[in-house]
């Protein structure tokens, strides 16, 4: 057999670029530090032109025209996926709900802000079954309005319009959600290896009695909220009520909002389980090429309309599922309910001895009627004492229920959009809401000479370089790019709860704030404390750079306001408390997760890259900003001077590194054995990890002294301005 014949039938593709075939570095070294979460969503994956500005594009959109098209869509039933009772409202609401419902308050990740429902794993979660059809129904509208309307905004707007088309007066709508172009790499959805894995399975998200792992909110892998059939699929409304309360609290919802959202979400639409789940094909990511991104296709028939299977439960919650009314509470509270099985075998609750007029007209045959149904979570609204009180109040006052729901729906769908300054469009409500973290606008300007004069006053105030830099950093480091909360704007570092956080060193903080407040009072011109905090850091860095022989001006744009305690929800802000800060070489206690992993997580939330992280850590060390003044990682004899000494000494082979305790190392001179410095894991990782070492070596070079300073200033400014949405 010749060479040509022997090669027939073999794959002609070199597999070096095929991630499905080749093992990657994390396969070989699973404990290695994975920096990928810092390198996602860059311009290489973004097809938009470099000058494209979504805010400008959205502001040119005729929102009223879009809403007219969406209203028309609601009742334009398509043969390939017919609308229940001729109305797509329930489907569109579920799509919007599940887009927003992945948000969790602990780390601000998830939510509706990026259009991530289009990508794996969310597009293939069991709880998102058949939402691929909802997005395909929306495609003609997305196609028509193009780049002026992101998928992320369209999905939420479609849910809003669906409610309006069925009679609810919504609270408002804001645009401004920009689409991503590939799945997020930073979101931890759980460690389970199978969908809907029960609690007792390995890698469970529960421990103890029923303690849900942080930062997760959903009870199972592949669910948005709770299991509709009960805890681990076993009906028990009171146990389910406990899950509901935890899950919704982790989405920043209280009991009243929880009941309103549960009832309002189930006032319209239906569950689908009129068939066999085993007849469904794979989810979208597991389907064949010809399915073109659709999943859950019925292999034994059309499986659409009255015969569709989604959750497995079958039926509507209310008598009139295409109109907004108070029917949910009428049925829930006025009937006794018993457990039944759906045609697909799912556990659901159905009323006993229901009146004919309260039954639901069949989707497929207007001459037939069926019982309404309730999930285990719905029954929790009746069985749990606190939920029951709220349900009865809503039942007795339908107008109040509608108002509470409209506000809770707005909160659900806008929670991760950030402060009101990021909201776009003509339907933005005028009211400032506490959960939006309001900040008063400023009414002053500072020219260049006034800024120079303020810097001089700050440097002459008696505060050290490290005190000024550390305070500015502490004020800004709370920013989360996940839900756009936190940051230096507002100067909430001087308010509860931040002023008392251990991470902020309250005693040192009060000393600095006292000096800044006295300086503010002495000025002839109005300047916010928020601006003074940031400007103090800038002045200190310029001084430290000058002493290192580098002249640099740290960019500063005034305009930050000072929030009041009344504008600050203490409980809501508690989730922003730092429990670790690699940049100041501190963690509250030892954790299961390694310090360097926590550093990556915080860095990603702040929107920084790996090289920005590197240069900031190196600069913060030599500026002497360590928590409590510790010397770990301070590889310099010139503390307070912005040199590249951290990197020079980290990469110097004259030293050896030895463990000296938990998260503690000694840097020893090879020749003498003398201990030169001490360090933590987050110091040494910049010499250990091959990628971070490459950055460290670059900054240690003899020609990098000025570059180091300028890169540090650029990264610093990025952190200080992360929440300046007025500058976008």
UniProtKB/Swiss-Prot annotation:
Covalent link Tryptophyl-tyrosyl-methioninium (Trp-Tyr) (with M-251), residues: 97-225
Binding site for heme b: 266
CDD domains xref list: catalase_peroxidase_1 (cd00649), catalase_peroxidase_2 (cd08200)
Cysteines paired by S-S bonds: none
InterPro entries: Catalase_peroxidase, Haem_peroxidase, Haem_peroxidase_sf, Peroxidases_AS
Entry cofactors: heme b
Subunit structure comment from the entry: Homodimer or homotetramer.
Protein name: Catalase-peroxidase 1
Species name: Shewanella sp. (strain MR-4)
